[in-house]
């Protein structure tokens, strides 16, 4: 029996400000075994979602008594090296507060680049290095550092924009939502959960069907999460094959849901098997 009644896939964007209407922000939802469908933003003058709008919508959805698994495609934390360099305790909730104080990317009229160039915030006191990678990025093979800005496929800007949003969700929802794996590798029965995902693991396995790349990434997230939940494989990916020390690190740095954890002969972590195009939830 599936653990979650619905899944939500979010293709994120760190462009512009928290209230900017962004074409790259896309949300798909899967419920009741049906095909994933796009969720439009609430009626307003804005054509597309805003980061703040998505956060507020998630608060409403996750406050409902419907076990929901949400996958968001930006980094949820930083490499352990970052904590060491800046003298921070390896504590994720404390990290969220500290990061938002220095990188208040959730504030009105604030671009990530405003903080990068020193015109706002205190980002200079909390810098990272593009050579620093989390364990999960090393195992993913191809995933870029959360500090690797200004390159194709970078998640740095979306990560720096998105982490304060996670803090907002945690403050508003409290224990109602399980932030995986920071709150533990096991998601309590009946609880909703939010996890970091990497849609490149799955997107090639589904037919594009006229969707834009952003739409397809969000569709792939929601669809794969629902399929994995229904066929029982999700439980395996929620418990990746990591040593005890690796698990300790990953509960600070975070982990990409969909990576099994153990290295294969090529030095890359085992990943979800590629599901053929045209598969459905039925």
Regions of interest found by a model, annotated:
Residues 1-8, 12-282:
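RNase H-like (RuvC/DEDD) metal-dependent nuclease/polynucleotide-processing core
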